[in-house]
Amino acid sequence: MNATKAPGGIKPKHQRLVLLVIALVALIGAGLLAAYALSNQASYFYVPNDLVKNPPEQGRAIRLGGMVQKGSLKTRADGITIDFVVGDGKARVPVRYTGITPDLFVEGSGVVAEGRMEGQTFVADNLLAKHDENYVPRQMGDMTKAQAEAVVAETK
């Protein structure tokens, strides 16, 4: 029995097998590259107690979540840099942020700060203010309950 060979001297059955192996190796390689890239971009979430007990390496991007401690919010002379303390009832972490703060960012409110540790201070690049289920946007604050319900009904 004499099998026909493809133009390159490889049997068609073996040629398909070689192509399958090459495709599989390329797919695995792409998956490993994607996993490596994502692991370097991931921001781990910490609460102050976890951050104090097990700090990440300096300069690693993380998220810090907790409550802005009352009496800790201070604005620097430049007018856009603020210092405050984030706590979780067990530990406190000083935070520095330069930029415009979210409207809901006030002392005693929840916050998620994205940034990195520099020494003992967390330097935030971004602030996300958290609110409770009773939040009412500033624009809706002057509306009556019936008007607010009508607006909500329109969005459903």
Curated annotation (Swiss-Prot):
- Residues exposed to the Periplasmic side: 38-156
Which annotated residues bind heme?
131, 135
Query: Which segments does the topology annotation call Cytoplasmic?
Result: 1-16
Which cell locations does it reside in?
Cell inner membrane
- Keyword match Metal-binding: yes
- The residue ranges crossing the membrane are 17-37
SUPFAM superfamilies named in the record:
Heme chaperone CcmE (SSF82093)
GO CC terms of this entry: plasma membrane
| One Pfam family recorded for the sequence | CcmE
What is known about what this protein does? Heme chaperone required for the biogenesis of c-type cytochromes. Transiently binds heme delivered by CcmC and transfers the heme to apo-cytochromes in a process facilitated by CcmF and CcmH.
Family, similarity comment: Belongs to the CcmE/CycJ family.
Q: What is this protein called?
A: Cytochrome c-type biogenesis protein CcmE
Query: Which species is the source of this protein?
Result: Novosphingobium aromaticivorans (strain ATCC 700278 / DSM 12444 / CCUG 56034 / CIP 105152 / NBRC 16084 / F199)
